[in-house]
């Protein structure tokens, strides 16, 4: 892992991470940083790790501990004896999204092909964020990679299954959003009010088109 650290306000440090790390390695990093004293929050994305400290914690003093953890975790990853407990999620989807026809047109595919490609890909949780329980799932099939919508919607319905860039994801709650809507998750909630986010870094996710449950 890259060890370059920069202050992020007066209560946090941010480290830039190298390209190519998988979700499991990010999960190990998250758990190592979260266990440090005076750390109140850790956000690990594909490109950065943000470590938020409790108010009043000396920034420079915490830097050394964070740098040591980054170095230790990085060095241990190839032979890490304790791998994180990764889970696999199957998400049933009703492919009724408002943008399905538009995505098919932009991709040069039929709507059925879009559904088959999206549901036929295995995804990994690359990052968590944006909303509680929202998982950025990679890697979307290149045939479906599109930029975000030019004008975000003021309200995306809860449980919408959507795509943007190389990612797909499920909106846990209704919110503004600029992703392309392909469908609606059925019988799946990305956020549990008691337990928090259902998915974690490194977890695997597969979407199943409604009506094809038995085929899977």
Predicted segment positions?
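Glycine-rich active-site loops that engage anionic ligands at enzyme catalytic sites
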Residues: 1-216
């Amino acid at each position: 892992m890259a060890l370059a650290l920069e202050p992020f306000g007066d209560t946090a440090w941010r480290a830039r991470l190298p390209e190519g790390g998988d979700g499991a390695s990010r999960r190990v990093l998250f758990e190592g940083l979260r266990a440090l004293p005076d750390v109140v929050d850790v956000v690990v994305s594909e490109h950065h790790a943000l470590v938020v400290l409790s108010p009043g914690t000396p920034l420079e003093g915490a830097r050394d501990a964070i740098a040591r953890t980054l170095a230790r975790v990085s060095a241990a990853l190839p032979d890490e004896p304790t791998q994180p407990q990764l889970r696999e999620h199957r998400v049933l989807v009703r492919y009724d999204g408002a943008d399905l026809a538009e995505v098919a047109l932009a991709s040069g595919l039929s709507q059925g092909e879009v559904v088959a490609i999206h549901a036929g890909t295995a995804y990994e949780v690359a990052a968590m964020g944006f909303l509680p329980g929202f998982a950025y799932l990679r890697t979307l099939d290149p045939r479906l990679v599109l930029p975000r919508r030019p004008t975000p919607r003021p309200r995306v319905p809860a449980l919408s299954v959507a795509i943007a860039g190389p990612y797909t994801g499920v909106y846990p709650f209704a919110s503004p959003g600029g992703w392309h809507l392909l469908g609606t998750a059925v019988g799946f909630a990305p956020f549990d009010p008691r337990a928090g986010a259902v998915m974690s870094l490194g977890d695997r996710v597969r979407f199943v088109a409604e009506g094809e449950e038995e085929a899977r």
